[in-house]
Structure formats: structure tokens, C-alpha cells
């Protein structure tokens, strides 16, 4: 088993002005062989941009390379990881220069996972993790992924694929969208033949003391896996979209127009978009801009809506007036013009200007706001715009709290 170790320096320009890797850095150095484990160690230094938003000490990024999709009928020939240790980010690759090195790779991998909380990957839930689980079962090994949280950035990219106008959800596609430069020219499938060719000639070249051809093949195999992992550190910025849509933004101001309310916000983090985005919904328009500003335009409706009382058993429905009145008052109405109210008929009507109700925190202010609907079973409810304006305090409208 060959081990490649690198220390990663934090330099943002890495992905936008990346230097070519010196070929000599991946050729095995006989002076760095660990005799006890027969492991060859190659040292190098590279750079990357750190974009993860969770505690870096708890993170492991990983990716695997195999000779096929089936764990039973293929070989696990490379595992790469990046993790924070000793005040710097470390990058390690375990490469199987013999086909029976799989157990060594898995042992080394799970040694790194000890005491880590997050395992970050790209489509690892769909392939990498199930594949390793099968290998663990195949070799009757005592390892599990149950004690570490899996974060699959593929699922995040898939969620925003349409919004970002991506052709597909492949890693190279989101890398290109985020302007991440990739030197590797091959995909995992193409490198299967490269690995098979490496295995054929490596032992012969090692006996001859001439590793020229196998070293070139090894470089291609390692580079693909390296860029899959290191570029993934930059792809983590896509998670900021989750923060955005969870409401993690700063309110600036609002403006009430004739037919809409415009609420303006900004984020204190760089949004992972390369063009302005506009999302249109039934009741609002969301504009997400490259300058990290966000504008939400909420429609204003001028119509007659209904407020439904919850304690309908204490109300009569007045047939002519088409409203519900409390029994203490309605008892004086002729019986032929009143009936016991039902949940769907226990309402009052009011013509006013309304805004749609979105998710909000039910604090002492919003609890006392009346929710109006068009019909009883409607999921969409509304608030009176006049009430919201009256409740505005210190330039921070309750409307902001509602969205």
C-alpha cells in the first residue's frame, strides 16, 4: 500500500490560479519507505480555499476510487481524505499498488475517522459508503458509519439544480459553476483501465528499478482523487444556500407599494451564485443577487376575506348576513334566520388589504394577529396589512418576522 501525505495551506487563489503539480512529487521515494508496514510515503504541499461552515476539527472529507460499481466484483484501489489536524489541513491518500491491499486501505481510513463528527462527500450516500460497507462485510471487519454524520453535498446541489440552471449534478459541473479549476482530464470510469495497466507494469518496473511508465499512470490516478476531494472543500460553499433559505439573513428595510411590499436583506456570507437569480411564486418574488443582497416582493391583495373563530359551538351562523355571531347576541335573532355554526361557517368577513402569511415565529405580537382565509380548508392564510404597519417598531416590521 502506498501512502501519499500532503499539508494544505489556506490560499484562496488556489482554485482560480492553480499551479501545475510537479511530477516528481508523486514518484515514490525509497528513502521514505516505512519498513514495518511496507508502506511508501510521498510528501508534498498544496493549497486550497477553506469554505466549510462547521467546526473544521470535526470534519473529514473523503472519496474513493474503484474498478467497478459492484463491491463484490471490483477492487477498492484508492481512498483519499482531507481533515484538520495540528493547526493545518492534512490530505492523505491510501493507494493499493497490489490488489490485496483493500483491508489495509479500510483500516487506515477508519483510523482517521476516530473522534470525527462529520463525513463530507459527493454522492457518498449513493455509492462510496454503501461500497465500503460491502467491503467491510466481505472481509468480516468490525467497522461502522453509525457514529459519524454523513453530509452529502450531491443532495444539496441536486436541490438547487434548477435554480442554478445546471445541466446535471456531476461534481465537475458544480465545480465549473463555482469557477473551480480542475487539471484532471479523466473520469473515474476511464481510470479503471489506467489502474489495471498500472498493476500490470508496476511490479515489473519495480524489479528493474525503472518506474517511469507506472509513475505517469500513478500521477493520473492520484490527481483525479485529489481534486475530487480538495475541490470539494470549495464546493461546501453551496451549503450557504441552505442558510439563505432558512432565513439566515440580515434585514435592511422595507417599502410598501400599491400592489406589493418590498423587503430588503443582505447576507454576511458570500452567496455561491455567479448571476442574479429570480424565483417567482404565487404570492411573492425572491431576487437573490451576486452582491449578497436579497429582495423579497410580497403581493398585496385587496379583497374580502374571512376570519374563522375556533370555538364555533358558541356561535350561530346568520343565513342572510353570511356571518357568525356569538350566541349571547344571536339568541335575539329569529330562529329561522340562524343555525348552529360549523367550523366552516363560523366566520366574519372583512374587506381590506392583506399580505400572505409565511412561516413565522409566534411571539406575543404575531399571536394576537388574526389570520384570514378565502375558504375554511385553504392552507394559505393572510394578515391585514394595516395591522402589520401599526405594529412596526424601530423600523423592523413584523412583516419581516413573518417571512
Regions picked out by a protein language model, each given a short descriptive name:
Residues 1-62, 67-74, 84-403:
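DEDD superfamily 3′-5′ metal-dependent exonuclease/proofreading module
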Residues 79-81:
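Short beta-strand scaffold segments in enzyme catalytic cores
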Amino acid at each position: 500500500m502506498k501512502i501519499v501525505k500532503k499539508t494544505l495551506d489556506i490560499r484562496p487563489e488556489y482554485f482560480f490560479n492553480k499551479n501545475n503539480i510537479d511530477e516528481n512529487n508523486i514518484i515514490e521515494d525509497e528513502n521514505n519507505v516505512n519498513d514495518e508496514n511496507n508502506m511508501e510515503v510521498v510528501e508534498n504541499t498544496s493549497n486550497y480555499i477553506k469554505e466549510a461552515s462547521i467546526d473544521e476539527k470535526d470534519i473529514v472529507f473523503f472519496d474513493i476510487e474503484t474498478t467497478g460499481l459492484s463491491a463484490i466484483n471490483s477492487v477498492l484501489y484508492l481512498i483519499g481524505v482531507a481533515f484538520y489536524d495540528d493547526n493545518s489541513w492534512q490530505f492523505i491518500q491510501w493507494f493499493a499498488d497490489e490488489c490485496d491491499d483493500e483491508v489495509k486501505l479500510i483500516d487506515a481510513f477508519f483510523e482517521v475517522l476516530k473522534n470525527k463528527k462529520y463525513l463530507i462527500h459527493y454522492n457518498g450516500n449513493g455509492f462510496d459508503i454503501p461500497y465500503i460497507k460491502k467491503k467491510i462485510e466481505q472481509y468480516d471487519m468490525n467497522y461502522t458509519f453509525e457514529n459519524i454524520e454523513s453530509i452529502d453535498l450531491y443532495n444539496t446541489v441536486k436541490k438547487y439544480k434548477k435554480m442554478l440552471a445546471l445541466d446535471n449534478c456531476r461534481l465537475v459541473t458544480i465545480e465549473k459553476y463555482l469557477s473551480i479549476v480542475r487539471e484532471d482530464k479523466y473520469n473515474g470510469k476511464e481510470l479503471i483501465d489506467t489502474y489495471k495497466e498500472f498493476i500490470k507494469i508496476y511490479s515489473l518496473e519495480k524489479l528493474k528499478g525503472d518506474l517511469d511508465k507506472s509513475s505517469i499512470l500513478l500521477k493520473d490516478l492520484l490527481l483525479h482523487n485529489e481534486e475530487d476531494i480538495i475541490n470539494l472543500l470549495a464546493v461546501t460553499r453551496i451549503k450557504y444556500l441552505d442558510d439563505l433559505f432558512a432565513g439566515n439573513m440580515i434585514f435592511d428595510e422595507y417599502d410598501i407599494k400599491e400592489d406589493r411590499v418590498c423587503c430588503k436583506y443582505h447576507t454576511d456570507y458570500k452567496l455561491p451564485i455567479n448571476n442574479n437569480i429570480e424565483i417567482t411564486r404565487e404570492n411573492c418574488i425572491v431576487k437573490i443577487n451576486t452582491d449578497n443582497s436579497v429582495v423579497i416582493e410580497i403581493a398585496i391583495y385587496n379583497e374580502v376575506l374571512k376570519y374563522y373563530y375556533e370555538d364555533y359551538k358558541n356561535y350561530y351562523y346568520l343565513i342572510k348576513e353570511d356571518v357568525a355571531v356569538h350566541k349571547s347576541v344571536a339568541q335575539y335573532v329569529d330562529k329561522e334566520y340562524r343555525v348552529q355554526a360549523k367550523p366552516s361557517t363560523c366566520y366574519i368577513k372583512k374587506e381590506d388589504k392583506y399580505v400572505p402569511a409565511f412561516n413565522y415565529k409566534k411571539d406575543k405580537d404575531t399571536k394576537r394577529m388574526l389570520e384570514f382565509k378565502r375558504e375554511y380548508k385553504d392552507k394559505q392564510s393572510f394578515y391585514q396589512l394595516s395591522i402589520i404597519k401599526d405594529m412596526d417598531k424601530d423600523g423592523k416590521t413584523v412583516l419581516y418576522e413573518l417571512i
